[in-house]
Amino acid sequence: MPDYRSRTTTHGRNMAGARGLWRATGVKDEDFGKPIIAIANSFTQFVPGHVHLKDLGQLVAGEIEKAGGIAKEFNTIAVDDGIAMGHDGMLYSLPSRELIADSVEYMVNAHCADALVCISNCDKITPGMLMAALRLNIPTIFVSGGPMEAGKAQVGGKTLALDLVDAMVAAADDRVSAEDVAVIERSACPTCGSCSGMFTANSMNCLTEALGLSLPGNGSVLATHADRRRLFVEAGHLIVDLARRYYEQNDGSVLPRAIASFKAFENAMTLDIAMGGSTNTVLHLLAAAHEAGVPFMMADIDRLSRGVPCLCKVAPAKNDVHMEDVHRAGGIMAILGELDRAGLLHADLPTVHSSSLGEALMRWDIRRSNSEMVQTFYKAAPGNVPTTQAFSQEKRYEALDLDRETGVIRDQAHAFSQDGGLAVLFGNLAEEGSIVKTAGVDESILTFAGPARVFESQDSAVEAILAGRIVAGDVVVIRYEGPRGGPGMQEMLYPTSYLKSKGLGKACALITDGRFSGGTSGLSIGHVSPEAAEGGMIALVEEGDRIEIDIKTRSLILAVPEAELARRRGVMEAKGANAFKPRERQRQVSTALRAYAAFTTSAARGAVRDLDQKPRF
């Protein structure tokens, strides 16, 4: 039976100094021997998805102490990808994931905490904390801040449901008046919470439900709704129970690595494909699996993507559907329920809250459950009042969305498509793979070919798009924006949004070794691996080269003779130290970013660090 980790600092004569310091934090004689639960909060006033978290750590702490534990809270950093977007601030977004993971590890291991509650929400915070939880492998529960309400506004005589991307697209569209842009801007992000569509933050919070590491509703109940408070209260009690089961009953089934098994990662990816989640989830699931020692690879994602239907389309894939609508249709448990009925789910896996996912579905899938509490829970509605306060309203829909033929969530027979919402493309331009969010691609361009328009940075591509130098039929190629080449693998939301603004969203393709925001739609192919800075084929593309894309056959081809490509590679390699570097790019790269670039790996590996590539380590 394992000892409580905290005994290292709380027991024995030689720990008198440590106990003295614990006492200075409020620990009393009778507390020594109780499990010490770390609360990793991520409150910041920079990020709307985290601005309401300040008091929620102490809410959880109070429940932990009621349950017989000792709660100790600390904070991590949190980058707002929307605010960091479109300038060099985006270089720091993906690297912040590793910094968050490390900071959680540092705090938990330095102070010998016994268990962990992760209060996350936005794009890199949930993945970073997930990586840390799997690295530490102590009892852990995730509870996120919850989604933002969708904006509502009268524009052009119509009532529109809005989000961040609508504001970006409208601002770059000359056909939209300044007055309408101002209305959209003021209405797009009305409350606290993670941006209201199926963007990266909400996608990852949904996936924690499928992995089994968070409570039902974690991914979908609104940040503003009073029902979300219950998740924080339950998390406080449950984490103490999990700690006791592990340390006092030797029950290793409650540990993150026991729960987040290979099959659990398959469940998470199956959900992601079915709901058309952000392409960034691929990067983060690969990284989390790496931390867990689970051999979940790009090939597994490719395999799953070929057999899972698209059961749910949410903004940006469907502009009038947001997370509040997904919740009304039964949330993530409803999507998992449809996948289970289709025979596409491993329902026998444990979760932090139930002996098996199947048992949880019997209670929480609204098509199976007769529980009045569950039915009421999924009727939680937006308050439609701008606020930065959590749990500030209690509105409910009169009825649930149970329509599985034409509703927000479909059954397999009435799927949006039998091909899922994400696909992995391979070919000579992406030998290790690339990712496209097929849920956001119009059917008319599932097969596409055109001349390459090559750019060495996101900035130069944006300039060309806004100047009207990109025309229908072009394939925009943005390279040297991968994990190492950026460094930091910037998101390309501005280029894709501006293509839509110019009426080219269904007439052009964009290919990059960078990545895309969860808000991206259109024929946007990211994570091209190997990246340009690693000598990938994307570095050899020249202006006007024909590029052929076929989502149905999962192919991405640079239609240039092999002999010519070999010649180009020889010319590039002859540059020596200057080979596989951007020709002209004005970019200040800090010491912190250079250190990140030195250790990061391909997007096909989740852009995790590889210390083995540096012999001195």
Curated annotation (Swiss-Prot):
<dbReference type="InterPro" id="IPR020558">
    <property type="entry name" value="DiOHA_6PGluconate_deHydtase_CS"/>
</dbReference>
<comment type="pathway">
    <text>Amino-acid biosynthesis; L-valine biosynthesis; L-valine from pyruvate: step 3/4.</text>
</comment>
<feature type="modified residue" description="N6-carboxylysine">
    <location>
        <position position="124"/>
    </location>
</feature>
<keyword id="KW-0100">Branched-chain amino acid biosynthesis</keyword>
<keyword id="KW-0028">Amino-acid biosynthesis</keyword>
<keyword id="KW-0456">Lyase</keyword>
<dbReference type="GO" id="GO:0000287">
    <property type="term" value="F:magnesium ion binding"/>
</dbReference>
<keyword id="KW-0001">2Fe-2S</keyword>
<dbReference type="InterPro" id="IPR004404">
    <property type="entry name" value="DihydroxyA_deHydtase"/>
</dbReference>
<dbReference type="Pfam" id="PF24877">
    <property type="entry name" value="ILV_EDD_C"/>
</dbReference>
<feature type="binding site">
    <location>
        <position position="491"/>
    </location>
    <ligand>
        <name>Mg(2+)</name>
    </ligand>
</feature>
<comment type="similarity">
    <text>Belongs to the IlvD/Edd family.</text>
</comment>
<feature type="binding site">
    <location>
        <position position="195"/>
    </location>
    <ligand>
        <name>[2Fe-2S] cluster</name>
    </ligand>
</feature>
<dbReference type="GO" id="GO:0051537">
    <property type="term" value="F:2 iron, 2 sulfur cluster binding"/>
</dbReference>
<feature type="binding site">
    <location>
        <position position="81"/>
    </location>
    <ligand>
        <name>Mg(2+)</name>
    </ligand>
</feature>
<feature type="binding site">
    <location>
        <position position="123"/>
    </location>
    <ligand>
        <name>Mg(2+)</name>
    </ligand>
</feature>
<comment type="subunit">
    <text>Homodimer.</text>
</comment>
<keyword id="KW-0408">Iron</keyword>
<dbReference type="GO" id="GO:0005829">
    <property type="term" value="C:cytosol"/>
</dbReference>
<dbReference type="GO" id="GO:0009099">
    <property type="term" value="P:L-valine biosynthetic process"/>
</dbReference>
<dbReference type="InterPro" id="IPR042096">
    <property type="entry name" value="Dihydro-acid_dehy_C"/>
</dbReference>
<keyword id="KW-0460">Magnesium</keyword>
<dbReference type="GO" id="GO:0009097">
    <property type="term" value="P:isoleucine biosynthetic process"/>
</dbReference>
<dbReference type="InterPro" id="IPR037237">
    <property type="entry name" value="IlvD/EDD_N"/>
</dbReference>
<comment type="function">
    <text>Functions in the biosynthesis of branched-chain amino acids. Catalyzes the dehydration of (2R,3R)-2,3-dihydroxy-3-methylpentanoate (2,3-dihydroxy-3-methylvalerate) into 2-oxo-3-methylpentanoate (2-oxo-3-methylvalerate) and of (2R)-2,3-dihydroxy-3-methylbutanoate (2,3-dihydroxyisovalerate) into 2-oxo-3-methylbutanoate (2-oxoisovalerate), the penultimate precursor to L-isoleucine and L-valine, respectively.</text>
</comment>
<comment type="pathway">
    <text>Amino-acid biosynthesis; L-isoleucine biosynthesis; L-isoleucine from 2-oxobutanoate: step 3/4.</text>
</comment>
<feature type="binding site" description="via carbamate group">
    <location>
        <position position="124"/>
    </location>
    <ligand>
        <name>Mg(2+)</name>
    </ligand>
</feature>
<protein>
    <recommendedName>
        <fullName>Dihydroxy-acid dehydratase</fullName>
        <ecNumber>4.2.1.9</ecNumber>
    </recommendedName>
</protein>
<dbReference type="InterPro" id="IPR000581">
    <property type="entry name" value="ILV_EDD_N"/>
</dbReference>
<dbReference type="GO" id="GO:0004160">
    <property type="term" value="F:dihydroxy-acid dehydratase activity"/>
</dbReference>
<feature type="active site" description="Proton acceptor">
    <location>
        <position position="517"/>
    </location>
</feature>
<feature type="binding site">
    <location>
        <position position="122"/>
    </location>
    <ligand>
        <name>[2Fe-2S] cluster</name>
    </ligand>
</feature>
<keyword id="KW-0479">Metal-binding</keyword>
<dbReference type="Pfam" id="PF00920">
    <property type="entry name" value="ILVD_EDD_N"/>
</dbReference>
<keyword id="KW-0411">Iron-sulfur</keyword>
<dbReference type="InterPro" id="IPR056740">
    <property type="entry name" value="ILV_EDD_C"/>
</dbReference>
